[in-house]
UniProtKB/Swiss-Prot annotation:
Component of the mitochondrial ribosome large subunit (39S) which comprises a 16S rRNA and about 50 distinct proteins. Belongs to the universal ribosomal protein uL2 family. The gene is Mrpl2. Keywords: Mitochondrion, Ribonucleoprotein, Ribosomal protein, Transit peptide. The keyword Ribonucleoprotein applies. This is Large ribosomal subunit protein uL2m. The keyword Ribosomal protein applies. It comes from the Eukaryota. Pfam families: Ribosomal_L2, Ribosomal_L2_C. The lineage of its organism: Eukaryota, Metazoa, Chordata, Craniata, Vertebrata.
């Protein structure tokens, strides 16, 4: 009697489990479900055998869309934040994230850029407006000349209504340049305060572009110019490289008071870990010689001269 009761209980348990399995959707692959005769489920309940994955090419296409613009425009361009991630989606910089929405304004760092229809000769432009730029520490200025407008880095005392000169001429005598004018280094007198300096002629400004910074034209030697950077390091470039006269705008940028941690989050800066680190030999000031002069002049080697 006990054996018959146990057999009937097991038979009822197996039938109940089969009924429950038929009612509940399964997560088995589609090929295995179709081969099983006992489970006849509708196609809508059959789960696919893979999960769609976003490829890195799709991410990179969306990530650099606002950077890959080839046509210049003075209109603000919508900017996509990276969050410290590269094109694969992995975090590369942990201190970047969040922040207020920003629009990118294309800055023309090549000051001497004559229009296509005109000959390459000095030309003047008028400052339309000087405004704040969320993507950099310095202020920017909208200048107009001829049939075009463009954004440039504003100097310290630049204001709307000013007229600036852009030249590529190097004369026998040094010019009496005004603040905001752009001239080759060979045309400026020694001791001039400069900013937005080119490393190679026609490449565009690459040095001294931060707010409140300026360099000094120390001397001119054999067709080259020696410049002192804000870090006190000296740099040698060709005298045909263009520079802007004066000091970069927003001089009090380094004296601003953040006031609270939330303002850094507005700027897109994430908090640090807060881990205490013992101050070792890397901390504090040290007496060390200045680094050697950086040269962008490709002089012929001694072997080539011999």
């Amino acid at each position: 009697m006990a054996l018959c009761a146990l057999t009937s209980a097991l038979r009822s348990l197996s039938l109940a489990s089969a009924a429950i399995t038929a009612r509940v959707p399964t997560l088995l692959p589609a090929a295995q479900i179709q081969s099983n005769v006992l489970l006849q489920l509708p196609p809508a309940l059959v789960s696919p055998s893979y999960r769609p994955v976003h490829m890195s090419a799709d991410r990179s296409a969306k990530f650099v869309s606002w950077k890959s613009r080839t046509k210049y425009t003075v209109k603000p361009v919508k900017m996509r934040k990276s969050g410290g991630r590269d094109h694969t989606g992995r975090i590369r910089v942990h201190g970047i994230g969040g922040g207020h929405k920003q629009n990118y304004r294309m800055i023309d760092f090549l000051r001497f850029r004559p229009e296509k229809e005109k000959a390459p000769e000095p030309f003047e432009e008028k400052v339309v407006v000087v405004r704040y730029d969320p993507c950099r520490s310095a202020d920017i200025a909208l200048v107009a000349g001829g049939s075009r407008k463009r954004w440039i880095i504003a100097t310290e005392n630049m204001k709307a209504g000013d007229t600036i000169l852009n030249s590529n001429h190097i004369g026998r005598m040094a010019v009496a340049a005004q603040e905001g004018d752009a001239h080759p280094l060979g045309a400026l007198p020694v001791g001039t305060l400069i900013n937005n300096v080119e490393s190679e002629p026609g490449r565009g400004a690459q040095y001294i572009r931060a707010a409140g910074t300026c360099g000094v034209l120390l001397r001119k030697v054999n067709g080259t110019a020696i410049i002192q950077l804000p870090s006190k390091r000296q740099m040698q470039v060709l005298e045909s490289c263009t520079a802007t006269v004066g000091r970069v705008s927003n001089v009090n940028h380094n004296q601003r008071v953040i006031g609270k941690a939330g303002r850094n989050r507005w700027l897109g800066k994430r908090p640090n870990s807060g881990l205490w680190q013992r101050k070792g030999g890397w901390a504090g000031r040290k007496i060390r010689p200045l680094p050697p002069m950086k040269s962008y002049v490709k002089l012929p080697s001694a072997a080539a001269q011999n």
